[in-house]
Amino acid sequence: MEWKLEQSMREQALLKAQLTQLKESLKEVQLERDEYAEHLKGERARWQQRMRKMSQEVCSLKKEKKHDKYRVEKLERSLSKLKNQMAEPLPPEPPAVPSEVELQHLRKELERVAGALQAQVEYNQRISLLNEGQKERLREQEERLQEQQERLPEQEERLQQLAEPQNSFKELNNENKSVLQLEQQVKELQEKLGKERLEAASQQKQQLTAQLSLMALPGEGHGGEHLDSEGEEAPRPMPSVPEDLESREAMSGFMDHLEEKADLSELVEKEELGFFQYYRERCHQKVYHPITKPGGSAKDAAPGGGHHQAGPGQGGDEGEAAGAAGDGVAAGGDYKGHSKFLVTAQNPAHEPSPGAPAPQELGAAHKHGDLCEVSLTDSVEPVQGEAREGSPHDNPTAQPIVQDHQEHPGLGSNCCVPFFCWAWLPRRRR
């Protein structure tokens, strides 16, 4: 669960980084989109305004063209009338010579009409040229409008592409919410697991205190068989399935409870194995410590003659059993060294406490190869290394033991080797 939690936290950090990057890119894309949309709006407004002006100019030019056509037609009619009048032979009139004033007036009128006609023709030519230029401009504008219309779907696609990061942002938000929900579930599971561990630890502690109380009681009338029976592990009661579980939901809940109980028992066994290994290493260190002292010996470290190595005639299992017995005796000897300070704390005159077994009993138990109960208040002759230790206040190792003994005075009468040493010995025998 912790690995999943770390993985979810890493994924959450990566998602947050991606989310920030996407937010920044989304802001940039939105700014570009807004600028491009404003640019398009401005271009459209300008083109629409120009188209309106051009359409107004075209309408005015059309009106002027119609008016000019009407005037040209009128002048052409008048000119044709004048030509006809000039081409028709004059009726015979009485020989009367027209006056020069009338002739001059007619000539002036003819010149004026010809000049007006010429000016109208030139004006029409200019208008036609302007119309051609306007037509070319209109074609260009139509082509540009077509290009703009062709670009519109591309722009719409681009706007859709710009809107895609927003959708991805929403998806990331949903993923982030799911990750937060998963993290909350993991926290709830961790809290539940912690509560179950505490409950299992409390139950285990109660069982261990019960075992310690049973082991603290002296064995009566059974000898080596009683010690062997106490050294072996008690079989665990198998969980019984209740008979009233008929529904599937109740059965599934019961099976889940059994699985959780099995997981917790495995965790407790792992912790016990680690603690056993630590205690064994500590026992070995305390066995080797008095040997390395000047004047110390292996007999002082392991009273009762414990052998750690199997002889040439022994098998592998016998060697292991002998090594286990030697380790147990070493642990008992170490605790005997500490019991001296307990005796000095309670009995200043080094009087043996009542109910303590003799050293011969320890030797006999070691010969059997099975140590079930070793008293910490045995009267053991101090070796040269222990003689230099003095009072419990001079030894920092013994001070917490004496303090614990003073805080719990009930343990002084029959202090035993802890239960985990005897739980470890049957494993060594197997």
Swiss-Prot record:
Top-rank taxon, per record: Eukaryota
Residue ranges, annotated region (Disordered): 138-158, 217-239, 290-331, 382-406
GO cellular component, one term: cis-Golgi network
Any one GO biological process: Golgi organization
Compositional bias ranges of the Gly residues kind: 303-316
Biased composition (Basic and acidic residues): 222-235
InterPro entries named in the record: GM130_C, GOLGA_cons_dom, Golgin_A
Keywords on record: Coiled coil
Residue ranges of coiled coil: 2-217
UniProt similarity note: Belongs to the GOLGA8 family.
Name recorded for this polypeptide: Putative golgin subfamily A member 8D
